[in-house]
Regions:
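Aromatic- and acid-rich polysaccharide-binding/catalytic face
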Residues: 127, 171, 226-260, 266, ...
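Active-site groove signature of glycoside hydrolases
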Residues: 161-190, 210-218, 238-250
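Active-site clefts of carbohydrate-active enzymes
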Residues: 211, 216-218, 272-299
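Acidic, Ser/Thr
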Residues: 38-44
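Short beta-strand elements bearing conserved aromatic residues within extracellular beta-rich modules
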Residues: 50-52
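Conserved structural position at the C-terminal beta-strand
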Residues: 81-83
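Structural beta-strand segments of beta-rich domains
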Residues: 33-37
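Boundary/entry segment of secreted carbohydrate-active catalytic domains
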Residues: 99-132, 146-148
Length: 300
C-alpha cells in the first residue's frame, strides 16, 4: 500500500562556523608590538596543531587558538592559519590583511569624545587613567591603562585580570603635581625610594609593563630620578618591557629639532637600557596658539 503525505516539512540545520581568523579583523588596524592573532576551531574535525603564517612565512606552531606575534613594522601585513587535523586532513583559513600603526593618542575625556581615533589611524590610546572610554568610536582601538600615581595602585590586580596587554606605570614621578603658584603641572610626584619599594606590586603579572615615565630624559644630567630607579638592585630590570619617554622642547626646531629629539632622547635612552621605547608625550612647551608662529609650532 502507499501513503500520501502532504504539507510542508522544515528541517532546521545549524550551519557550521567557517574556520577563520577572528582577530585582527580583515583590513583592520592594530597597535605595533604584541599582536594577538586569534581564530576559531576548524570545521572538519579536531586539530592536533595549528601552523601560523604571517606575510607568507611560517612563524610558529601552537595547539591553542591564539598566537601572540610581535612586530613594530608599520605596514600592511597578512596572516593565515593551517590546521592539522587529527584525522590527517588539513584545513586553512582565508588570508586576512591588517595594518600596524605605532601612533597612539593621549587624551582626556573632554577631548576624547570629540575625536575619531580610527579616522586618525590610531592603533592605541591612553587616558592617564585605569578605565577605557565607553564611546563607540574607541571600541576597536586598543586601550592601555596607566597607574598614574601611588593612589591608583589598588587597580593593578583588576587590570591584570582584565586581559589588558600593556600597563603604563607612574606618570612623571620626577615632577610635582603643582607649581609654586598652585597651577597643576601634571607630575605624580612619587619619591624614587617609594617607587622602588612599590615596584613589586606591578611586576609578575600577565601584561607587558612599562617603566615609570619620567618628565626629564634619563640621558640628560637632570634625569637623576629615572637613573636612580633603574640602578636600584631592588628593581628587577627583567620586569620592565619598555620605557615610556616624555619630551617638551622649549622652542620649535623643525627637522633639526626632530632629529635632535631622536638622537639625544630616544637613541640615547635606548643605548642606556636596551629596552623598546614608547614616546607617550612630546610637544614644544609654550602652549600658546594666539600668534601665527605659535600655530605653526602646534600644527607641526
Amino acid at each position: 500500500f502507499s501513503v500520501n503525505v502532504t504539507g510542508t516539512f522544515i528541517e532546521s540545520v545549524k550551519a557550521a562556523t567557517e574556520f577563520q581568523i577572528t582577530s585582527p579583523s580583515d583590513n583592520g588596524l592594530v597597535a605595533a608590538g604584541y599582536i594577538d592573532i586569534k581564530w576559531n576551531n576548524p570545521v572538519g574535525g579536531s586539530a592536533s596543531k595549528y601552523n601560523v603564517y604571517v606575510d607568507g612565512n611560517y612563524v610558529n606552531s601552537t595547539t591553542s587558538t591564539t598566537y601572540e606575534y610581535y612586530t613594530t613594522s608599520v605596514a600592511y601585513h597578512t596572516a593565515w592559519i593551517e590546521a592539522e587535523l587529527s584525522n590527517g586532513a588539513k584545513e586553512y583559513t582565508k588570508t586576512v590583511k591588517f595594518g600596524v600603526s605605532k601612533k597612539g593618542l593621549a587624551v582626556n575625556d573632554n577631548m576624547g569624545r570629540r575625536l575619531d581615533p580610527v579616522a586618525m589611524n590610531m592603533g592605541w590610546y591612553y587616558t592617564w587613567g585605569t578605565t577605557p572610554f565607553s564611546y563607540t568610536t574607541y571600541g576597536s582601538v586598543e586601550f592601555v591603562p596607566m597607574i598614574w600615581g601611588t593612589g591608583s595602585e589598588n587597580a593593578i590586580s583588576r587590570i591584570a585580570s582584565s586581559g589588558y596587554k600593556y600597563l603604563l606605570a607612574y606618570n612623571e614621578p620626577d615632577m610635582p603635581m603643582y607649581d609654586t603658584n598652585g597651577n597643576f603641572v601634571g607630575g605624580s610626584n612619587v619619591d624614587v625610594n617609594t617607587a622602588i619599594s612599590h615596584w613589586y606590586k606591578f611586576a609578575g603579572k600577565s601584561y607587558h609593563l612599562g617603566a615609570p615615565a619620567p618628565a626629564l630624559c634619563p640621558a640628560w644630567d637632570s634625569g637623576t630620578w629615572f637613573r636612580t630607579f633603574m640602578d636600584s638592585d631592588l628593581v628587577d630590570k627583567s620586569t620592565i618591557d619598555f620605557i615610556p619617554l616624555h619630551c617638551y622642547y622649549g622652542t620649535y626646531g623643525g627637522a633639526e629639532g626632530a632629529n635632535t629629539f631622536l638622537k639625544e632622547v630616544v637613541d640615547a635612552t635606548y643605548n642606556m637600557y636596551h629596552k623598546p621605547i614608547w614616546i607617550t608625550e612630546f610637544a614644544v612647551s609654550g602652549w600658546g596658539y594666539s600668534t601665527a608662529s605659535n600655530r605653526k609650532q602646534v600644527e607641526a
